[in-house]
């Protein structure tokens, strides 16, 4: 299983991006209006205030820069209200503030124990260039931080819940001719004894962006676990 775990890490890194709270915050919720499937497992996609799950739309599914990995099973894509209102022109829309929920086809049907999940977290360390947030915040604010496209900078790894491992990255993204810095979270979730992933992307706009990203990212994870307990 250790070799499989290493492979999990590699694929997770490639397909993800290009305040900690107690696990007691997750409460089981009944009913589900939006089901997705990963093999024989039913995944309930939670409702998130201010966002719309939109992966069922053909124009969303066809956007190549979001879903170009053959080894991914996309379970859902949550758009901000602004992006959802522009869905008719989705292929050309500059996205911000969105979640992608996915799994890996190669490991469909494989059960992951708590111990293996912890090992997965250990193997994930050191896979990115690491810098402290305090060491880069001034450069981010004044636009002088040096980040190459395809080489994100890891600024934090933490566990908002015992079944979620979160890595926070700074990434450079291009929209047309415009370059921008975004905060991306990569999340590995042990859900129904399987591995599910979600990534959150938010353009960096102020010193409070990181705090807001972590809060919204963690909230999404609690809702996802709560709907699938």
Language-model-derived ranges and their functions:
Residues 2-10, 21:
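Sec-dependent signal peptide recognition
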Residues 15-16:
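C-terminal motif of bacterial Sec signal peptides marking the signal peptidase cleavage site
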Residues 23-74:
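Start-of-domain marker
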Residues 65-179:
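Conserved polar/disulfide-associated segments of primarily extracytoplasmic proteins
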Residues 174-176, 186, 218-219:
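Core RNA-modification/binding signature centered on pseudouridine synthases
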Residues 180-191:
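Short, surface-exposed beta-strand/loop micro-motifs that present aromatic residues
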Residues 193-229:
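Surface-exposed amphipathic alpha-helical segments
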């Amino acid at each position: 299983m250790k070799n499989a775990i290493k492979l999990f890490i590699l694929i997770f890194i490639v397909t993800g991006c290009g305040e900690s709270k107690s696990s007691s915050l997750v409460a089981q919720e009944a009913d589900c209006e939006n089901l997705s499937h990963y093999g024989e497992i039913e995944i309930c996609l939670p409702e998130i205030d201010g966002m719309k799950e939109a992966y069922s739309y053909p124009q969303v599914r066809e956007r190549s820069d979001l879903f170009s990995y053959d080894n991914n099973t996309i379970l859902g894509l949550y758009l901000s209200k602004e992006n959802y209102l522009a869905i008719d022109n989705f292929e050309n829309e500059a996205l911000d503030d969105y979640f992608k929920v996915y799994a890996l086809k190669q490991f469909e049907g494989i059960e992951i124990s708590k111990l293996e999940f912890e090992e997965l977290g250990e193997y994930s360390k050191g896979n990115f260039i690491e810098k402290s947030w305090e060491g880069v915040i001034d450069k981010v604010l004044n636009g002088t931080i040096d980040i190459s496209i395809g080489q994100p900078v890891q600024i934090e790894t933490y566990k908002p819940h015992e079944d979620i491992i979160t890595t926070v990255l700074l990434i450079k993204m291009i929209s047309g001719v415009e370059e921008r810095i975004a905060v991306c979270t990569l999340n590995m979730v042990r859900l129904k004894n399987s591995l599910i992933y979600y990534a959150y992307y938010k353009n960096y706009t102020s010193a409070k962006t990181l705090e807001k990203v972590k809060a919204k990212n963690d909230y999404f994870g609690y809702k996802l676990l709560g709907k699938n307990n």
